[in-house]
Each structure stands twice: as C-alpha cells, then as structure tokens.
A protein has these predicted regions:
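Conserved GNAT-fold acetyl-CoA-binding loop/helix
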Residues: 22-45, 56, 90-91
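A short helix-loop-beta-strand connector motif used in the catalytic cores of GNAT acetyltransferases and
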Residues: 46-59, 76-80, 108
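Conserved GNAT acetyl-CoA-binding A-motif
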Residues: 106-107, 119, 128, 135-148
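A short beta-loop-alpha structural element at the N-terminal edge
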Residues: 1-15, 23-28
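Conserved acetyl-CoA-binding loop-helix of GNAT-fold acetyltransferases
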Residues: 114, 120-133, 137, 156-160
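C-terminal "cap" of GNAT-fold acetyltransferases
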Residues: 141-155, 160-162, 168-184
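Conserved beta-strand in the GNAT
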Residues: 59, 65-74, 108, 113
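Conserved acyl-donor/pantetheine-binding loop and adjacent beta-alpha core of acyl/acetyltransferases
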Residues: 74-107, 111
C-alpha cells in the first residue's frame, strides 16, 4: 500500500532514502558525521517545507511496516524547498551550494529506495507509477530523475518504465544520466 509519509516515519524513511542519496546525504546535511547527518536529515524530514519533507515523501507499506520510500517534488519549487536546508548549512558555517538536479518544469523523483529484504517484488515500480499519478493530478507534463553513470542496470530499469535518457548532468562531482518520462 502506498501512502503519504508521516513524521513518525522519519527514522525508517531517512534510512531508506540515504540508500539512494549515497554521499549526497552528507552534502545535504552539511556534515560528514554519520550520526549528525541522520539527525539533520530527520529534522528536515519532519519539517513542512524542504526537499525531503515528509510532505514530499511517499511510502510503501507491507504489514504496516515501511519497506520502500520515494521523495518527489516539482523543480519549480526548489527555491522555496531549499531555504531551510541552506539556513542549516549557514548555521554549520558551511558554504553549501545546492545543485539543481532537475529543471523547473519537471516533477522530480529525488530519491527512491526499497528495503533490501523486499527487493524484486515490484515495489519500486509501484512507487514510480504513483509518481506518474501524482504528476498528472498536479498537471505536470513530465517526470524526471537522474541515474549514476556507473549503474547501467538501474538505467535499464528506468528505461523499461518508459524514461528516456536526454543527456548528462554533473552533480556533486558525480556524473549522471538525466531521464525524462512524458506524462500524457
């Protein structure tokens, strides 16, 4: 079952979303300390308005346990969504510059992850299909995401769902494929 995340899902969702974020999680939190990173990301998650707010996260639950999570938002909202994150960085004396991972006209899948014990059951596909539904409900014309160039299997998975590779992006010193799926 796919539901809007709740603030009480913070610990599990941050653990899952960090699987997808990899090193970018530390960059976003403004720290290289793992414990502090989790603390800061959990604070962002329970907040109302930022990239990884619970309001932008959808969870897949099985037997009432969160086993998958997906963070999505509209690229045109990034200035508003980044305000709290940049304020946190400033408080930590960090010169954080957030990358525009998506374009202003894209409904963006920022991160998606499924608990390792539940992979291979189609949960990621269901979450992505849900992103298409949300995008359509909000009158967005396309859904986007990025895939690390070193992950050809992941790229093939997204292409099998109808995403088209439209180019490359360099974000936080990593190279990514930029993928788009038009919403009809």
């Amino acid at each position: 079952m796919i539901l809007q995340a709740q603030t009480t899902d913070a610990k599990t969702c941050i653990k899952l979303l960090r699987l997808a974020m990899e090193d970018a999680a530390f960059y976003l939190a403004g720290t290289s300390d793992d414990r502090l990173c989790n603390e800061i990301l959990s604070k962002f998650f329970t907040s109302e308005v930022n990239r990884i707010s619970y309001k932008n996260v959808y969870v897949y639950k099985e037997n009432s346990a969160v086993v998958g999570a997906m963070c999505v938002y509209f690229g045109g909202d990034l200035d508003i969504l980044d305000t709290e994150i940049l304020a946190n960085a400033k408080a930590l004396n960090s010169n954080l510059v957030l990358a525009n991972e998506c374009e202003e006209d894209e409904f963006y899948i920022d991160s998606i992850a499924v608990d390792e014990k539940f992979r291979g059951k189609g949960i990621a596909s269901k979450l992505i299909s849900h992103a298409f539904v949300i995008a359509k409900e909000k009158n967005h014309k396309k859904v986007s995401l990025i895939v690390d160039e070193t992950k050809p299997k992941t790229l093939a998975f997204y292409e099998s769902l109808g995403f088209k590779n439209i180019g490359k992006k360099e974000i936080y010193k990593h190279r990514y494929h930029h993928l788009i799926k038009e919403i009809i």
